[in-house]
């Protein structure tokens, strides 16, 4: 046999290498075999670790190495492969042997590499457990707080403080009793705020003991309250839904939860709003792809008594399992608004048409000629319960209504008046001492006496004021006289200048009841916007209809003042406002802050015309009217009726904070509070105008339009010229003040300003006629200056003087500014007359900025018979990009009436891109060249709100320039975005990529840290970690550092940045353990399975140092044979405990259960229950169960009448627990003990489960309770057909009078609800106005309003079957006080969306999106489609999802009707 040269003893070099590799592999495998755990762990921490600095830890980490394969071994192994291939002298037998050995070792090597890859974990931690346990991190905070009005220090605008520390998050029940609510709130909140100008006192906060606030919270609260006092924070109640609910005695969305038997003031910081074991229906979540599926509630909960973090040495075999839970309260009673007696805004809105008008000059800017003052009332009206109310409707009809209060209030009206009058005398007689304003007690008395000196003078003054108020017209005077007509008398008759009214009111002939005082506007001149120009931006999250609403409110301010709201240009507008949504609801800063963008938040319940106008008033520089220093002469504050903790909203401002503009107190101001703002109840007054004998108390708190005082005040604040006005019409005629009165010579200088505003895409054409102005050198002294824009720095078109006639001037933009100065009026120079027209169409171009295009008259309805053609061009080598932001054009299948036509080129013969109409915004589009043709056409009838669009130059930046993206570049319309590959995520610079946070961790112990820890975490970050332990194990998470955004006075639900911990119960089932924020260390969290999920979220402002946590696993003894427990086994750290079902008691052996004799099944709709032996003591070791069940679609209400159960801070000994469902596995509504009667409790479904458990010591008398039923609730539609009924005794008796019930029926995503009425017998009436059933498309998730209505039904004919357009429906049943009938029954089922028809809003011809929810003046549109055969045919393919009941085809309901009434 031939042998290779140089190979001794017959052993080849290849075999040697393979033998060495095999030995190395054996050694590595033996090392791994020493660890019996299936997952590689980290070394245990050393006891009593010494804190280490971040730099020390970083140095240690620099020397850490990940396990790798020796490079020389790889080289030798790969080299052996080549050695075999290169040897040409090996014989065939040896070749076969070597190849076999090589293949065998190659397989072993591949297996080894596979082992290395499997052991390489997808998540890389920065720290070991030892390092993390001894790491000390200093908390950090970023400096971007000013943009968010809810978070900004020194905030100046509308926002409210919290009512105090909310206490531990434990059992809670709805508050239905007003007295109990009052007592609870008084115990929860601080005793009283500091005086306005006193320094904060926090000495008692830190040493207050367990019944006082947390010291840190008290410091924060006092600091913020001082900002309120010194900075003048102002509050709007409309956006604070929790306060509205409390006023109407509804449960709060963020309830204050109390342990039974515990003092309410024993509180927990809001930094820990949700504790482990605090369960609610929202605690059960889905994995991201199944987040809307139904999750069955789990009975297992986690609770800890240790609020601070655990050290490793403290983790012992025992761990508390006591459970306290949150409760999501459901009540079908609606929230009553402050203005419930004012007509609903959906019926009082109408479009202000543009029409040519000839305008008479006035000394103050006048109101527009269109009736633009009839708008929705979104604020409180402040009317007295028995006041008469006049309503102006869209046709100009005045209808009078009487507000009616409770009978008791009517009967005691005289007594109440005497009480309030006496209280008023005490208020006026009490001395008031303020910084910068001291007034003696005798001066107060003297002023009080002056108020009652002369009865005939008061009567005369009241008559004058009455006539002046009636003379304030809500519409502008329109003159149709010929040009030669002398109009001086007419101008005098039209209106009296506001300043003249003020002078007359404060003349020497009257007592000083309303002297010249400080008006509620800012005294800080730096907060006044330069040139009266307020730039704005609108968040892209708002719908087109909301953007139109904001523009309409801004136009309302422009129409009456010289203030201009303009789209922000980054090059010239460093300071600007941003319309956005913040958690504070309706809030804004007062005036200009001067540090860049400032937010104006239009949140839930704030998207009403009057409220937006009000918030813009704060932007302009207005404070609330009732905060004036002289307010005690005009209103009385009822402090006893103010919600506890909201008194600071009624503090007076000092004269240093407001300017003296000589304006009288304005009860009619849109900036005035309503009478019951922040009251404890809807019918309690917090602020009342002073009532003078024989004079009706004025109304306050209107949110309809700017008052005459608001207009005059704004014009004074911004030094608006006394003559001139703002035009928003499509055409008009105006003239200088002396044009028609040349004979009335005067040496007074005329200074006027006219502002003509059109929409984007329109231009202004002005024709000067009969101009006769003194001709000075370069027109320096007397002139008419015309600018192409909105302020004095806009491009100058020309300055004119002398004589000019028939001069035509055109703008390139959509605005024109005219400034007129006449100093030679005495010499008979008449000035000028002008006529303007607004024309649409023309050539538009854009270079670097973004261009805008709107339909004529937007946001109001476009005009009839319009044809506008725009040619849009951009520089060469670019394309034109067009994006519609809102779109509402008369609909037609072929778009033959009104339409928008877009072509790919400069002319009408260019290739057609599309013709669009209807309500769905067209898709984004771009041209192939550098030009685009856009044409808008309207016919003679049916005008809609029109469209708003932006255009820009477009190029593929990813191809043509150095985009700077580290991984991938994605081209977008008008720009580009960077993207990262899988496993990475985008850095905050939006270009570079970094390792993605989160991941799956399969280790028995380890660490988790927030991104960039210990540095500040990034903005807008979403991280998810999943820790997976071996089967039959549990995972515990212990936080070692915690510093997230969130303080007690900013939030209570971790709405900004948060960490949420879930127990993963299955592949797609999650149960929330807790949600945490702030700086308090969360308690240890333990999973209920072998998987635990951690989610981290950060918002777009304010960063902190983040968090760090250690996790470890523990075996679950309950996983094997249920731990030997007969009923329930609950795992604890290092051990387990056995528990019995309700109605059973534990056997002496600690594992078995024996049956009890205290079980009750209750199905009666009404009744009373008692504890065993009541009124004697209940027995020891009792385990009693009451199971309530009622008619489907109704809920159980439980009211305790007497209650006396052994007391304990955590109700450990004896307790009564109430569950929201059929067993104790349902969510907990409350756990009670002690002798305080619990609050009334309501279930969310038709079942309730109550348990009484007692121990062997100390028995009490027990309880008695009444149970009843309530209609309405939340129904979950599934694939199984379910039913619900109109009233609890359906089939046995008629429904009750005065019912108002709501059912929300929700189906899973990608499904719709099919609602079928099985029986129907409702009192019949015309238009169904007495008793009726309404069906809506659910309630808007953001703003809490009804969606589009499918129909309103009555009579005894079955309504058509209804299929929801979305995945939910809302059914409302309302009855009056007479003629009850049998009621109705209905079935509902969830039907998956078929491929034939998509129920999304995008595919519906008449879009029922959220944009149609909020009506406002000028865009109120009918959301109902006529049930024509043509429309029915269009949806005829619905037959794929038909249902059959009782052998009858029920069909499908696809088109909504407004009313349906019929009889068999």
UniProtKB/Swiss-Prot annotation:
Glycosylated position list: 214, 321, 486, 541, 559, 747, 1005, 1038, 1327
Q: Which cofactor does it need?
A: Zn(2+)
Where along the chain is composition biased (Low complexity)?
191-203
Q: State the taxonomy lineage.
A: Eukaryota, Metazoa, Ecdysozoa, Arthropoda, Hexapoda
Residue numbers binding Zn(2+)? 614, 618, 624
What is the protein name stated in its UniProt record? Protein tolkin
According to its UniProt record, this protein's enzyme class is hydrolase
- SUPFAM superfamilies associated with the record: EGF/Laminin (SSF57196), Metalloproteases ('zincins'), catalytic domain (SSF55486), Spermadhesin, CUB domain (SSF49854)
Native organism:
Drosophila melanogaster
Tissue specificity is:
First expressed in the dorsal part of the blastoderm embryo. During germ band extension, expressed near the mesectoderm. During stage 10, three faint lateral spots of expression are seen in the thoracic segments. At stage 10-11, also expressed in optic lobe precursor cells. During germ band retraction, expressed at high levels in the somatic and visceral mesoderm. During dorsal closure, expressed in the cells that will form the corpus allatum of the ring gland.
Q: Name one GO molecular function term.
A: calcium ion binding
CUB domain location is: 723-839, 840-954, 997-1114, 1158-1270, 1271-1391
Q: Where is the Peptidase M12A domain?
A: 519-721
Q: What is the effect of changing residue 669 to F?
A: Abolishes ability to cleave sog
Q: Any idea which residues are catalytic in this one?
A: 615
The UniProt keyword set, sorted, is: Cell projection, Developmental protein, Disulfide bond, EGF-like domain, Glycoprotein, Hydrolase, Metal-binding, Metalloprotease, Neurogenesis, Protease, Repeat, Secreted, Signal, Zinc, Zymogen
What is an annotated GO biological process for this record, any one? positive regulation of activin receptor signaling pathway
Q: Which gene encodes it?
A: tok
């Amino acid at each position: 046999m031939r042998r290779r040269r140089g190979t001794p003893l017959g052993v080849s070099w290849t075999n040697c290498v393979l033998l060495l590799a095999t030995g190395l592999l054996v050694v590595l495998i033996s090392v791994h075999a020493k660890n019996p755990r299936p997952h590689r762990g980290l070394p245990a921490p050393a006891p009593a670790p010494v804190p280490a600095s971040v730099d020390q830890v970083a140095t240690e980490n620099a020397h850490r190495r990940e396990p790798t394969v020796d490079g020389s071994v790889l080289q030798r192994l790969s080299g052996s492969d080549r050695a075999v291939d290169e040897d040409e002298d090996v014989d065939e037998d040896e070749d076969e042997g070597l190849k076999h050995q090589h293949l065998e070792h190659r397989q072993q090597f591949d297996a080894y590499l596979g082992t290395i890859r499997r052991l390489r974990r997808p998540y890389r931690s920065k720290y070991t457990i030892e390092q993390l346990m001894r790491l000390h991190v200093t908390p950090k905070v970023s400096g971007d707080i000013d943009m968010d009005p809810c978070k900004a220090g020194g905030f100046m605008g509308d926002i409210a403080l919290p009512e105090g520390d909310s206490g531990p998050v434990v059992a809670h029940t709805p508050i239905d009793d007003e007295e109990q609510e009052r007592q609870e709130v008084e115990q929860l909140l601080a005793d009283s705020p500091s005086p306005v100008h006193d320094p904060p006192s926090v000495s008692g906060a830190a040493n207050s003991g367990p019944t006082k606030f947390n010291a840190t919270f008290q410091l924060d609260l006092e600091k913020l309250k001082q900002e309120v006092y010194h900075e003048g924070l102002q509050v709007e109640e409309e956006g604070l839904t929790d306060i509205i609910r409390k006023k109407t005695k509804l449960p709060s969305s963020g309830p204050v939860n109390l342990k039974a038997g515990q003092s309410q003031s024993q509180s927990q910081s809001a930094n820990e709003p949700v504790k482990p074991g605090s369960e609610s229906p929202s605690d059960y979540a889905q994995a991201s792809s199944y987040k809307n599926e139904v999750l069955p509630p789990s009975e297992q909960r986690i609770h800890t008594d240790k609020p601070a973090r655990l050290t490793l040495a403290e983790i012992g075999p025992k761990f508390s399992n006591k459970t306290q839970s949150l409760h999501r309260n459901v009540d079908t009673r609606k929230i009553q608004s402050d203005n419930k007696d004012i007509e609903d805004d959906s019926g009082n809105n109408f479009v202000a048409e543009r029409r040519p008008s000839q305008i008479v000059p006035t000394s103050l800017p006048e109101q527009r000629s269109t009736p633009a003052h009839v708008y929705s009332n979104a604020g409180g009206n402040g009317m007295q319960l028995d006041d008469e109310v006049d309503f102006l409707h869209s046709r100009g009809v005045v209808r009078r209504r009487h507000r009616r209060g409770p009978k008791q209030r009517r009967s005691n009206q005289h007594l109440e008046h005497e009480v309030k009058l006496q209280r008023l005398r005490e208020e006026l007689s009490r001395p008031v001492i303020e910084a910068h304003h001291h007034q003696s007690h005798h001066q107060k008395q003297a002023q009080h006496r002056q108020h009652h000196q002369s009865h005939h003078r008061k009567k005369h003054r009241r008559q004058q004021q009455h006539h002046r108020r009636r003379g304030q017209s809500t519409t502008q005077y329109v003159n149709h006289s010929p040009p030669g007509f002398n109009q001086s008398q007419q101008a005098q008759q039209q209106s009296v200048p506001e300043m003249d009214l003020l002078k007359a009111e404060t003349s020497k002939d009257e007592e000083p009841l309303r002297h010249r005082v400080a008006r509620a506007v800012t005294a800080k001149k730096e907060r006044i916007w330069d040139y009266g120009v307020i730039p704005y931006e609108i968040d892209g999250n708002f719908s087109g209809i909301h953007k139109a609403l904001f523009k309409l409110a801004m136009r309302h301010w422009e129409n009456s003042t010289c203030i201009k709201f303009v789209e922000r240009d980054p090059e010239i507008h460093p300071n600007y406002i941003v319309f956005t949504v913040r958690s504070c609801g309706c809030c804004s800063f007062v005036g200009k802050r001067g540090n860049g963008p400032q937010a104006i938040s239009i949140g839930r319940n704030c998207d009403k015309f009057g409220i937006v106008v009000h918030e813009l008033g704060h932007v302009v520089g207005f404070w609330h009217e009732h905060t004036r220093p002289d307010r005690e002469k005009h209103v009385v504050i009822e402090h006893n009726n103010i919600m506890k903790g909201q008194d600071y909203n009624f503090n007076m401002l000092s004269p240093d904070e407001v300017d003296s503009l000589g304006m009288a107190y304005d009860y009619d101001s849109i900036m005035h509070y309503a009478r019951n703002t922040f009251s404890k109840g809807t019918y309690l007054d917090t602020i009342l105008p002073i009532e003078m004998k024989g004079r009706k108390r004025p109304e306050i708190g209107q949110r309809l339009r700017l008052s005459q005082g608001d207009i005059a005040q704004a014009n004074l604040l911004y030094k608006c010229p006394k003559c001139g006005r703002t035009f928003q019409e499509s055409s008009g005629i105006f003239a200088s003040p002396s044009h028609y009165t040349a004979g009335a010579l005067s040496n007074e200088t005329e200074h006027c300003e006219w502002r003509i505003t059109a929409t984007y895409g329109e231009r202004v054409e002005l024709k000067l006629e009969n101009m006769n102005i003194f001709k000075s050198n370069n027109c320096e002294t007397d002139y008419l200056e015309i600018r192409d824009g909105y302020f004095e720095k806009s491009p100058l078109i020309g300055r004119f003087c002398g004589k000019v006639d028939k001069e035509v001037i055109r703008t390139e933009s959509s605005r024109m500014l005219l400034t007129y100065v006449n100093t030679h009026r005495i010499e008979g120079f008449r000035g000028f007359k002008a006529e303007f027209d607004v024309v649409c169409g023309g050539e538009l171009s854009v270079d670097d900025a973004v261009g805008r295009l709107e339909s004529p008259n937007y946001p109001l309805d476009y005009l009839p018979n319009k044809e506008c053609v725009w040619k849009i061009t951009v520089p060469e080598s670019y394309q034109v990009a067009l994006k519609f932001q809102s779109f509402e054009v008369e609909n037609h299948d072929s778009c033959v009436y009104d339409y928008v036509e877009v072509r790919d080129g400069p002319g009408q013969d260019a290739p057609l891109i599309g013709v669009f109409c209807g309500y769905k915004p067209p898709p984004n589009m771009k041209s192939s060249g550098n030009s685009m043709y856009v044409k808008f056409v309207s016919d003679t009838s049916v005008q809609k709100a029109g469209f708003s669009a932006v255009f820009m130059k477009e190029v593929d930046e990813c191809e043509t320039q150095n985009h700077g993206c580290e991984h991938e570049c994605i081209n977008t319309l008008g720009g580009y975005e960077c993207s990262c590959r899988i496993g990475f995520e985008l850095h905050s610079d939006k270009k570079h990529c970094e390792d993605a946070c989160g991941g799956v961790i399969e280790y028995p112990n380890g660490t988790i840290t927030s991104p960039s820890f210990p540095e500040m975490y990034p903005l807008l970050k979403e991280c998810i970690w999943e820790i997976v332990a071996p089967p039959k194990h549990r995972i515990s998470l212990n936080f070692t550092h915690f510093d997230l955004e969130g303080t007690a006075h900013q939030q209570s639900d971790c709405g900004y940045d948060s960490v949420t911990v879930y127990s993963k119960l299955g592949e797609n089932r999650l149960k929330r353990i807790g949600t945490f924020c702030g700086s308090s260390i969360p308690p240890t969290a333990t999973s209920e399975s072998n998987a635990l999920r951690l989610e981290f979220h950060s918002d777009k402002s304010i960063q902190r140092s983040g968090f760090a946590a250690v996790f470890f696993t523990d075996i679950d003894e309950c996983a094997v044979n249920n731990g030997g427990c007969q009923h329930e086994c609950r795992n604890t750290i290092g051990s387990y405990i056995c528990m019995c079902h309700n109605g059973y008691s534990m056997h002496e052996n600690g594992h078995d259960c024996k049956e009890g004799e205290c079980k009750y099944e209750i199905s009666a709709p009404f009744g009373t229950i008692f504890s065993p032996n009541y009124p004697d003591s209940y027995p020891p070791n009792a385990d009693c169960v009451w199971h309530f069940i009622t008619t489907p679609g109704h809920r159980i209400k439980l009211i305790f009448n007497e209650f006396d159960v052994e007391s304990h801070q955590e109700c450990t000994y004896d307790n009564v627990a109430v569950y929201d469902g059929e067993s104790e596995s349902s969510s907990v509504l409350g756990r009670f003990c002690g002798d305080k009667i619990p609050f009334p409790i309501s279930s969310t479904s038709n079942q309730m489960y109550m348990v009484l458990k007692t121990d062997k010591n100390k028995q009490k008398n027990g309880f008695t309770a009444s149970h009843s039923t309530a209609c309405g609730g939340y129904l979950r539609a599934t694939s199984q057909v379910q039913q619900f009924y109109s009233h609890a005794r359906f089939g046995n008796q008629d429904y009750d009078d005065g019912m108002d019930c709501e059912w929300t029926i929700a189906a899973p995503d990608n499904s719709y609800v099919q609602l079928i009425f099985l029986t129907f017998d409702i009192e019949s009436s015309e238009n169904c106005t007495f008793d009726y059933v309404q069906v809506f498309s659910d309630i808007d998730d953001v703003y809490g309003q009804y969606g589009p209505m499918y129909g309103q039904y009555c009579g005894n004919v079955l309504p058509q079957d209804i299929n929801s357009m979305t995945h939910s429906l809302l059914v409302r049943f309302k009855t009056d006080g007479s003629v009850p009938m049998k009621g109705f029954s209905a079935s509902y089922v969830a039907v998956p969306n078929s491929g034939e028809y998509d129920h999304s809003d995008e595919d519906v011809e008449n879009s029922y999106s959220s944009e149609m929810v909020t009506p406002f003046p000028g865009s109120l549109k009918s959301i109902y489609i006529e049930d024509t055969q043509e429309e029915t045919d269009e949806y005829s393919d619905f037959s794929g999802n038909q249902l059959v009941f009782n052998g009858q085809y029920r069909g499908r309901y696809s088109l909504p009707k407004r009313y349906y009434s019929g009889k068999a």
